[in-house]
Every structure is written in C-alpha cells, then in structure tokens.
Amino acid sequence: GNLLPILQSCYIRIYRFKNMKKNNLKIVKINENKSLFNYEKKVLIKELILDLKLGYFDFEKEAPQKVKFNLEINYEDKKPSSDKDIKSIVNYAKIVRLIKKLVKNKHYNFLETLAEDVFDELFKDKRIDKISLQIEKLEIMKDCSSVGIQISKKRSHDKL
C-alpha cells in the first residue's frame, strides 16, 4: 500500500524526463582560455624595522624611533603566477621599498596617519583586495616591549 504512491511518483518523473523537448536543454560552451579556479594569495612581510621620525610629543620629535611593521596583503588572481614574469606577482621587495620611500623624509604624529599613507600607496595596485597592517613603536615605553596599532582595510567593490 505505501510503496505504490512512491513508485507512481518515480514513474511520472521518468515519463516527464523522457518526453522533454530538446529546446529545454541548454548547451554551454566552455572557454578553454578561462581558468576554472580563483587563487587567493597573500604576501607576508614580518618585522620590517625602520628608524622613523614619529610622534606627537616634543620628546618624540628629538630623534628617530625604531618602528616595526607587519603586513598581510591579500589579492586574488585568476591564473597561477608565471615563473618568468615578476609582474604576475605582488612583489614583497617592491612593497618594502615603497614603505621605506614613503617614510624617508617625513614626520608622522600618529601611527594611524602613517598607516593610511601605507594603505593609499599599496592600494594603487588594483589586484590588492585587503591589507592587514600592524605598526609598533619598539622603544617608547619602558614597561612594554612595544606599543602600536593594528588596522585592516578592504577594498570596497561597490560602485559610487
């Protein structure tokens, strides 16, 4: 008794499938040049230590301070990196050079404004989707090995 409704339901589904018109089927072409994968890549820069002109208070403006940078830079790519083309990667050496150039002859009052300048510079590379940045002053407080900030900034894909 209970099996009959199930068998009838299966028969009806098979009958409908057999009698479908060809127009109901959609043919999809596969573009062989397009990758079926997205790569989520991350560049890591750990413990970049620089002497910077940094600080709000007068005593901080007397001499450069040791500052440590840690960065995680996320980007997506639709293809694997090429072993022959440096432009196919987000180059960590270039990022370090950019940060050094950015801070070379400039005084920052706050770590937060320094971070914004780093973000502005790095987000010029349109591949970069998200940056997590940690900046620490290493010698400013006797009771702490470091004090600092950590900020993450993500590119918005919304249209203005």
Segment roles from a protein language model:
Residues 11-160:
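N-terminal, polar/charged subdomain of small-to-medium soluble alpha/beta proteins
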